[in-house]
């Protein structure tokens, strides 16, 4: 993303927005991390990746019990930090569809609410807006009841992106990784 918007007096970049998404999905308990977080998931495993999903978060907690069990849910995110970038997205609906079909929920994530005008949000999409160091849901996404199974290429690129994202996050700074490291006894020991 080349364009940036101002958030307060600072320019907001895609990296800033991805950090906010990582904060939103930083959660864990005794069973481990709640979300597998992945930045920049490609549609193919090779070099010819024309389509990239900005961010995916797979909820690893099953949700519900018995017949109401929902199973893990995949959230896909398209990040926009400028109005012109959003308008480009609207002109090419196939870009989002390359990934949306695999997701239970699809979100547009913007640095400012003014990037999206009333009536522009495609049917079924949710909207998240930057607030502080995280994002807040402004419009809930509809659940996609016709989720398609991921191709082997997308499975591979998702796994690679989860690994890269987890390695990039600092376990001292990321609350989910910090808790998980403590539970797994992976905390750094200091000499006395």
Where is each model-derived feature located?
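Non-catalytic C-terminal interaction segments of nucleic acid-processing enzymes
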Residues: 1-35, 45-46, 118-192
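Short, solvent-exposed loop/turn segments at secondary-structure junctions
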Residues: 42-44, 62, 82, 113-115, ...
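Acidic-residue sensor for enzyme active/binding pockets
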Residues: 14, 39, 78
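Short amphipathic alpha-helical segment that frequently serves as the phosphate-/nucleotide-binding helix
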Residues: 15, 52-54, 90-93
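Active-site metal-binding core of divalent-cation-utilizing nuclease and nuclease-like domains
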Residues: 7-9, 24-75
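Catalytic cores of nucleic-acid endonucleases
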Residues: 71-123
């Amino acid at each position: 993303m080349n364009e940036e918007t101002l958030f307060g007096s600072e320019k907001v970049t895609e990296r800033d927005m991805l950090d906010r998404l990582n904060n939103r999905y930083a959660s864990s308990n005794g069973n481990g991390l709640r979300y597998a977080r992945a930045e920049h998931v490609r549609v193919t495993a090779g070099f010819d990746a024309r389509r990239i999903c900005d961010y995916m978060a797979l909820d690893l907690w099953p949700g519900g019990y018995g017949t109401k069990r929902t199973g893990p849910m995949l959230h896909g995110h398209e990040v926009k930090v400028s109005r012109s970038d959003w308008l480009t997205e609207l002109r090419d609906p196939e870009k989002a569809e390359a990934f949306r079909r695999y997701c239970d929920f699809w979100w547009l994530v913007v640095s400012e609410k003014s990037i999206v005008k009333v009536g522009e949000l495609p049917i079924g999409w949710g909207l998240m807006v930057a607030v502080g160091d995280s994002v807040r849901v402004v419009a809930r996404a509809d659940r996609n009841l016709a989720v398609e199974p991921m191709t082997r290429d997308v499975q591979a690129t998702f796994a690679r992106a989860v690994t890269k994202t987890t390695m990039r996050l600092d376990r001292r700074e990321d609350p989910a990784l910090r808790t998980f490291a403590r539970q797994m006894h992976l905390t750094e020991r200091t000499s006395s």
